[in-house]
Amino acid sequence: MWSTKELEAEVEAILSEKISKNWTIVLYNDDLNTFDWVIECLVKYCGHDTVQAEQCAWFVHTKGKYAVKFGDKYTLKPIYEALLEKGLNAALEQNKS
């Protein structure tokens, strides 16, 4: 059985993880998706303008991966899932503080 303090601590930990802005969607390079498709997905799902999406796509291509979106886990998870559904190779990662 949980004490009130233990329960409060557990709830606080869960909430801080969910609302923390320490999360990132990292997009990885692959040989399947075209620049145009990646740019289109970044504009549609991440809310980037075309220039920002083009820059992100170029960084992904040249560096192998790039953090394309930052925020809290609750906000980023549906974006991350949409990118995966569209065939992009992405990860949802918690930044180390």
Describe each PLM feature range.
Residues 1-97:
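Terminal domain-initiation and capping elements
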